[in-house]
């Protein structure tokens, strides 16, 4: 077993399983997908650690793969079915989208950094993932072209209720991510029902806030 394969097994056994992730499809996907492929060569030794990993080019604004356990727990809470359409927002190089692609019928992913989006496409091609695609778009915009979605997954946090993204959910659709407007921040699921959006807290969590989903500072005289 290679060093990366050993690290992958330890990540699943030591981080993901111990966080009450029991969906075998998610565990199998994380065991199968080489997370190091989504990480710059200089940071591959960090690929399986329990941290938010900046994968942006030097000199670019930070962009992250969130902690593996957060990805796993959000995907488990999403209850993605094999026929579901999924949108991953702020995907960076696409690891969360790749895991989701093992669960869903179709996955769209959006990323504002064109260089990272292209890297993600290259990794998807190398891994033979045919039901997932990355578009260059800002996180707050979503991807209305293929809406509505059964599930929208934020690869990060939001400080505001993402109304535009919620509008791209189908009836019964779920949006999941870290709501950083609360203290402490909490992983939250938002469900569309009869045109309204309901909120339910899942667990305490933290993640970097996605670009465009920051709270606008109030003007003070």
Predicted feature locations:
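Class I SAM-dependent transferase core
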Residues: 1-87, 95-98, 103, 116-130, ...
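Conserved nucleotide-cofactor-binding alpha/beta core module
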Residues: 75, 79-198
């Amino acid at each position: 077993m290679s060093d990366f394969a050993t690290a992958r097994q330890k990540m699943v056994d030591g981080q993901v399983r111990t966080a009450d992730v029991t969906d075998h499809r998610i565990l199998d996907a994380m065991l199968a997908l080489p997370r190091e492929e989504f990480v710059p060569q200089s940071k591959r030794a960090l690929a399986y650690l329990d941290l938010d990993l900046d994968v942006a080019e030097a000199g670019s604004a930070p962009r992250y793969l969130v902690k593996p356990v957060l990805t796993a727990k959000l995907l488990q809470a999403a209850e993605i079915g094999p026929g579901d359409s999924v949108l991953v927002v702020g995907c960076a190089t696409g690891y969360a989208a790749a895991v989701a692609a093992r669960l869903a019928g179709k996955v769209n992913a959006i990323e504002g950094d064109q260089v990272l989006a292209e890297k993600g496409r290259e990794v998807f091609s190398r891994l033979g993932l045919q039901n997932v695609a990355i578009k260059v778009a800002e996180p707050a915009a979503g991807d209305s072209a293929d809406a509505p979605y059964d599930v929208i997954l934020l690869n990060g946090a939001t400080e505001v209720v993402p109304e535009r993204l919620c509008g791209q959910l189908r009836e019964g659709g779920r949006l999941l991510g870290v709501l950083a407007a609360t203290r402490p921040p909490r992983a939250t699921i938002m469900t569309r029902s009869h045109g309204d959006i309901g909120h339910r807290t899942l667990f305490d969590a933290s993640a970097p806030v996605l670009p465009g989903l920051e709270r606008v500072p109030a003007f003070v005289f």
